[in-house]
Amino acid sequence: NNSMLGGEILSGEISYKGYGEDFLFKNSKSDFKATLNLNNINLDYHKDWPPIDNLAAEVIINNDELVANIISGYIFNAKIDNTSIIVRNLSQNNHHVLINTEIYSHTNDAKNFIVQSPLKNISTIDQLTKNIIGNIDINLNLDIPLDSEEIEFGGLVFFDKASIESGIPE
């Protein structure tokens, strides 16, 4: 599975303390850490979700956990910043990607994201966003299981200079 479609590794650091035969997850006393500073990454993280473009991030793998601190990136024209991504228990199956993010954008980008993701199957979201036009500030928490259709999410959406169209003819 190639989720990183392109970009640069600006710097990297790897350390491992333990026996070679225990590498990577075979002995809890082993200690593995890798840190990568990435830039201009195009990330297709899941086939059902829109990709992230021009991503700049610090990625840390510390033993059995991956943490990505997103500095900047874009989904469509929506700017992503102040984002953390965590994948725990890398050595096990049934991975969950936990995402906490803040995105400031226009409702058109939010609508495109919804239409091109599993969120389109949640009628409440469609109804809430259908007639709203303007800028939005999204604080979102997602739990995306990589081998399941169930998605858990929560968060806040703030509207800035937005309007609601009634759909009533003039």
Residues covered by each model-derived region:
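Strand-loop-strand
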Residues: 41-99, 120, 135, 160-170
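Extended amphipathic, helix-rich lipid-handling scaffolds
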Residues: 1-27, 35-39, 43, 89-152, ...
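Short "repeat-start/strand-capping" segments in structured domains, especially the N-termini
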Residues: 29-31, 53-54
